[in-house]
């Protein structure tokens, strides 16, 4: 896949990067705003929350570069759709592979996925969907979702916990 994608126009690859960053920032927001990392091992929880803050902090970098070099709306949307396809495919295949490596059979994998869906906050899932759909607005910019203060608070919380440990 890398070899094929490397032949695509740079403008499309940059648009895919900006689209993927919108996904990771949206998922980062989802982690920071909800309880997605609750129940994780404490060290893993801190890592996941830290990574979510990192995604939120740089969410507009590729988008700003894309705008600065004049990439238009059609390429931006095509890049987002291709990034969506890649992310969903890799996530599905990767999660199944990791669960199988852990020795889970198909029934256990279905149970694990059902448990994740059960734990989802429906309003937070809808808000996440709205945030992803916003990318299709012509006037969209990632900074329209101002969640950097929330990220800074969560990072400060982790820092306090680490110092107390």
Question: Where do the model's predicted regions map?
Answer:
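Non-heme di-metal
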Residues: 1-165
């Amino acid at each position: 896949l890398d070899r094929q994608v490397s032949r695509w126009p740079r403008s499309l690859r940059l648009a895919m990067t900006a689209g993927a960053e919108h996904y990771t920032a949206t998922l980062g927001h989802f982690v920071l705003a909800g309880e997605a990392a609750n129940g994780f091992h404490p060290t893993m929880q801190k890592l996941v929350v830290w990574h979510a803050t990192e995604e939120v902090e740089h969410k507009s970098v590729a988008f700003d570069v894309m705008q600065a070099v004049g990439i238009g709306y059609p390429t931006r949307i095509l890049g987002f759709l291709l990034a969506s396809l890649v992310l969903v495919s890799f996530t599905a295949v990767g999660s199944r592979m990791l669960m199988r490596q852990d020795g889970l059979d198909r029934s256990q994998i279905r149970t694990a996925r059902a448990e994740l869906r059960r734990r989802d906050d429906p309003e937070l899932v809808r808000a996440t969907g709205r945030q992803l759909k916003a990318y299709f607005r012509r006037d969209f910019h990632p900074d329209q979702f101002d969640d950097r203060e929330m990220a800074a608070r969560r990072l400060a919380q982790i820092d306090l916990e680490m110092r107390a440990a």
